[in-house]
UniProtKB/Swiss-Prot annotation:
This is Cytochrome c-type biogenesis protein CcmE. Heme chaperone required for the biogenesis of c-type cytochromes. Transiently binds heme delivered by CcmC and transfers the heme to apo-cytochromes in a process facilitated by CcmF and CcmH. The keyword Oxidoreductase does not apply. PANTHER family: CYTOCHROME C-TYPE BIOGENESIS PROTEIN CCME HOMOLOG, MITOCHONDRIAL. It is a single-pass type II membrane protein. Keywords: Cell inner membrane, Cell membrane, Cytochrome c-type biogenesis, Heme, Iron, Membrane, Metal-binding, Signal-anchor, Transmembrane, Transmembrane helix. GO terms for molecular function: heme binding; metal ion binding. Residues 29-140 are periplasmic. The gene is ccmE.
Length: 140
């Protein structure tokens, strides 16, 4: 085989290997992308009939949080449609009425059974242990 043909074969093999690696990386990233549906999209789309886990985001409706001995239920809204969510587990500290939340789970018999609840916050949020006290005396 001539040197020119060996070089061409090496370049083609390199491109094939790089393409396979890129395809593998993109397929793995696609599964870990963290998007969510709105309540309207979930209830009107094909995800409604699916038994696969999905993420749904919205605002927790004020006055909708109801705690029982083993679970908590609340309504999520995108200000068009409300979705009843049932969750058993520890809620995040920022969770509350009127707060944005993303839930991951399945829609079963008109209720969304959540496996995970995430509370959303704005870009200015700082944990209390990292914020400075408001009434600190100024140095003289």
């Amino acid at each position: 085989m001539k040197r020119k043909h060996k070089r061409l074969l090496f370049v083609l093999a390199s491109f094939c290997a790089a393409g396979c690696a890129l395809l593998f990386i993109l397929s793995e990233l696609r599964e870990s992308v963290s998007f969510f549906y709105t309540t309207s999209e979930l209830l009107s789309g094909p995800q409604r009939e699916s038994n696969l886990p999905v993420r749904v985001g919205g605002m927790v409706v004020k006055g909708s949080i109801a705690r029982s001995t083993d679970s908590i239920s609340f309504d999520l809204t995108d200000f068009k449609t409300e979705l009843n969510v049932v969750y058993s587990g520890m809620l995040p500290p920022l969770f509350g009425e009127g707060v944005g939340a993303v839930v991951k789970g399945r829609l079963l018999h008109g209720k969304f059974v959540a496996d995970e609840v995430l509370a959303k916050h704005d870009e200015k949020y700082m944990p209390k242990k990292y914020t400075a006290p408001k009434s600190s005396p100024e140095p003289k």
